């Protein structure tokens, strides 16, 4: 997948309907070569009042955006920032579509860049997480999330999440990631292409299989150490011949059977 610059984006809006609502904050972190290289965020005047509900959720007030630029003033800057990048967002379908709607409203073409959804990536590679909400993942994974529901903080944490997921992917056996990649074709936008990209890089410099794993019928499985019997050390004693002595020595380890006792004796 090219290019290799990931633009991790989050937007805050006055609501969820792109035809009626407006962006009030745009946040973006750039990732190259496995690290965050730059950050960009800006408050945006929506041209209307921000509801109390949104103010309470985001902490972005009408007073705060009073002197902020309108989206028309920054649309070209945002478009240029994202051009030739891979768009990443947590629930990409909202951010990508809303942002494109606003760009076209301002007379700019819609973005035609690849997109990756970190919600789907988290569901695949962090399957035991109890919740895939960004705030919950941040708490569970130990990310510092200073201002949930503010675009700059959400973009920062989403960037950290992408890097962590990629790290987890690269620790998987190649044969496991191959199978995940095949199944990932059902994911949205270009999430599957990202998985295939990581897979191809791993194949270029393959790591030896972890010695605790083994390949069985095309699956990388944890080796099982099957203990055929339990050895119990009873000390230097003579073999007990009476029923009472046997029960005292073996306790609940063995069940007393008269015929077996006769054969053992």
Residue spans for each PLM region:
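Conserved non-catalytic scaffold segment of RNase H-like nuclease domains
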Residues: 1-115, 127-149
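Acidic, divalent-metal-coordinating active-site segment for phosphoryl/phosphodiester hydrolysis
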Residues: 150-165
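Phosphodiester-processing cores and adjacent nucleic acid-binding clamps
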Residues: 103, 120-123
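Acidic two-metal-ion nuclease catalytic site recognized across multiple nuclease folds
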Residues: 2, 164-242
């Amino acid at each position: 997948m090219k290019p290799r610059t990931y633009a991790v984006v989050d937007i805050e809006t006055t609501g969820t309907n792109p035809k009626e609502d407006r962006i009030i904050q745009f946040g973006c972190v750039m990732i190259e070569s496995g690290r965050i290289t730059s950050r960009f965020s800006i408050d945006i005047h929506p041209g209307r009042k921000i509801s109390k509900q949104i103010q309470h959720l985001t902490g972005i007030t009408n007073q705060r955006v009073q002197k902020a630029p309108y989206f028309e003033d920054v649309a070209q800057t945002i478009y240029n920032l994202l051009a030739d990048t891979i768009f990443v967002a947590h629930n990409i379908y909202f951010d990508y579509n809303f942002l494109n709607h606003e760009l076209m409203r301002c007379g700019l073409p819609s973005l035609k860049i690849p997109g990756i959804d970190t919600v789907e990536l988290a569901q695949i590679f962090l399957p035991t997480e109890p919740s895939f909400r960004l705030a919950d993942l941040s708490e569970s994974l130990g990310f510092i999330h200073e201002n949930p529901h503010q675009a700059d903080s959400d973009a920062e944490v989403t960037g950290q999440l992408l890097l962590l997921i990629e790290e987890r992917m690269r620790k998987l056996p190649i044969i496991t990631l191959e199978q995940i990649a095949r199944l990932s074709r059902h994911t949205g936008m270009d999430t599957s292409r990202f998985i295939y990209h990581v897979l191809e890089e791993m194949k270029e410099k393959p790591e030896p299989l972890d010695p605790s794993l083994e390949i069985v019928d095309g699956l990388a499985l944890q080796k099982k150490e099957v203990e055929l019997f339990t050895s119990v050390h009873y000390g230097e004693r003579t073999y007990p011949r009476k029923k009472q002595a046997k029960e005292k020595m073996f306790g609940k380890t063995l069940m007393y059977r008269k015929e077996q006792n006769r054969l053992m004796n």
